[in-house]
Structures are given as C-alpha cells and as structure tokens.
Amino acid sequence: MPNQHTLLSSNLLPVGSNISTWWNFGSMLLTCLALQTSTGFFLAIHYTANINLAFSSVIHILRDVPNGWIIQNLHAIGASMFFICIYTHIARGLYYGSYLNKEVWLSGTMLLIMLMATSFFGYVLPWGQMSFWAATVITNLLTAIPYLGTILTTWLWGGFSIDNPTLTRFFALHFILPFMIISLSSIHIILLHSEGSNNPLGTNPDTDKIPFHPYHSYKDTLMITAMITSMLIIMSFMPNLFNDPENFSKANPLVTPQHIKPEWYFLFAYGILRSIPNKLGGTLALLMSILILTTAPFTHTSYTRSMTFRPLTQIMFWTLIVTFITITWSATKPVEPPFIFISQTASIIYFSFFIINPLLGWVENKIMMTNN
C-alpha cells in the first residue's frame, strides 16, 4: 500500500472489497447534513421567529428572495431525503449485524434521536396550521410525566400555552442542534473507522481489502449524484410532495384540523403512540419505538453476524419492514375502526421483532449444530 503522503494514505484507506451499495448511505447522510446546514443558514437569514411574522417571512422567502424558493424547497425535501437515507441505513445495520459494533450503533441511535428532535422543531417554524397543532399535541406528551410533567411543559412553552416564546426557543433549538449532530457524526465516523466497516457476509474483511479511493469513492459519488438528482426533480416538478395541505394556512389556535399528524417520517412513532389509549403508556411506547434499537447489540444470539444466510431471521426482518410501512400508513388515517386495530396489531408485531429475533438466533444455532 503506497504511503507517500498523509492525505494520499487517507484516500487509500483499506476497506473490505465486498461492501455493497447499502454501505453508501453513510456518505449520502453526510451530504444531506451539509445540504441542510447550508440551506438552513440562508433560510435563517430571512426568517423571523415571531408568531405574527413567521408565516409571512416564509412566504417572503419563497416569493421575494432571489432563488429563495430553491433554498426553501431543498431544505424541506432534504429533510425527507435525510430520513429516507437514515431509515435505510438503520435497516442495513439490522440486516447485516452492524449493530455488533456497539459504540457505533449507540452513537448512531443518539444521532437518530437528535435528528428527530431537530426536524420536529423545524416543522413548527413556518407557523402553519399543522405546525401549530402538531407542536401542541407532541409537547403536551410531557404532561404524562408524573409530578414534573406540567412544570416541564410550561417551561418548554415559556408560558401556559404555545405562543411567541415557544416559537423563539424552538428556532434557537433548531439552529443549535445541527451543530451537535455534526459533532456526534464526527464521533460516529471516528468510532467506525477505529474498528472498520462490517460487510454483507459479516466476516472479517482483513484478508481481502482494497483502497477506498477510487473503488468505493466512485460508488459513493454515483449514489450521491442519484440522490441530489432525485431531490432536484422533486423540487422542480413536485415541490409540495411531502408537505401537508393544512400547513398552507396560517396557524389558528381557534380552529382544530380534522386530523392532526406530524411529517411522514414521524408517522410510525406517532402511529404507535395513538395505538395505546393511555397517555403515559402511549408516550412510553413512542420513546421505546426508538430506544428499542439500543437493545439489538445485547440480544444478538446467533453465531452468524449477518442475516445473509439466516432465512428464518430474514422473514422476521422483512415482516418488520412491512410493519413499519403499515404503521406509517395507518397513522395517516382517522382514529376509528379498522385503523385502530391495524395500528395496535402492527405495533405489537414491531416490538415482537426485537423479542423473537434472539429466540430465532438460538433456533438457528441448534439447527447448525445438528447439521454439523
């Protein structure tokens, strides 16, 4: 391996030769983060964090600021693309057993939580009708905390209802959290490269490594180009594809939308929340829908790291993916039969994956031992 220069040697970082396209989503997420930070900065220049002016300032960006419509739409579509990439990234980690690198997996779970918080605060900023009511519903969940709930909610709101102080602090949080995400992403990448990437076979790649550049860097470039191209196509022809029609109306505390729902990327967690008729139980289920990912490294029982050669576990994995989509779909529907039953059933299946998976690992171990 040539070692003429530090920069050259970092480009020639040895990487397993068989990592597939599913490993490109990390670099795509970094691209999304850079895009969101840059477009967000230019939006913050023109945005006004005031309940009387916020909605008008967004319209001003779209209509009056040169290329403002490009910046605003890229930021909105970029958020959806960010979540598409991160959910695919997590699914790949679950499928190929990447979670066994505990530090990387746990730092990644923290990144997901911070990203969800950041995007929630950002969704409130335009001060549209759905922004206001989604903020009201989600922040109200804090009141489910025994003893401290009401105090925490009042502190977060900056008063006894969602008002100007709430919008101001949400803007401040939405501005500062991306820098924390950048810091944690750096830690995530450093931790990853201290041990090295996993691969589709889940084997030790030390026996067969190739330089990162040009082999994998070109693969990354291709996927990043495809992602940016798809974003530009959506921005040009379907800019409101991921937007809620209710959010084109200014926030009105006196008129409740017929169906309050967050952005699509929160719908799976929101669907789990709605499926439990108890406020505290629903809030705990909402938190557990994310935090249960942290259990994966500690409940792995199979002798094989990846699911590539584990057909029973593959069935469970694809059941999880279908369940995720089902919960997302059912959360867009009203809280009435049969959607309540569908959400509840799908939620049980979602959590059961993390219980059945270790049991299947034991079963597969027994089968392998018997065959040997």
Curated annotation (Swiss-Prot):
Binding positions for a ubiquinone per the UniProt entry: 193
A single Gene Ontology CC term: mitochondrial inner membrane
Keyword Manganese (UniProt): no
Residues that span the membrane, as ranges: 25-45, 69-90, 105-125, 170-190, 218-238, 280-300, 312-332, 339-358
Biological role: Component of the ubiquinol-cytochrome c reductase complex (complex III or cytochrome b-c1 complex) that is part of the mitochondrial respiratory chain. The b-c1 complex mediates electron transfer from ubiquinol to cytochrome c. Contributes to the generation of a proton gradient across the mitochondrial membrane that is then used for ATP synthesis.
Listed name of the protein: Cytochrome b
Cofactor note: Binds 2 heme b groups non-covalently.
Miscellaneous notes: Heme 1 (or BL or b562) is low-potential and absorbs at about 562 nm, and heme 2 (or BH or b566) is high-potential and absorbs at about 566 nm.
UniProt subunit comment: The cytochrome bc1 complex contains 3 respiratory subunits (MT-CYB, CYC1 and UQCRFS1), 2 core proteins (UQCRC1 and UQCRC2) and probably 6 low-molecular weight proteins.
Heme as UniProt keyword: yes
Cofactor needs: heme b
Species this protein is from: Hydrophis semperi (Lake Taal snake)
Binding sites annotated in the UniProt record for heme b b562: 75, 174
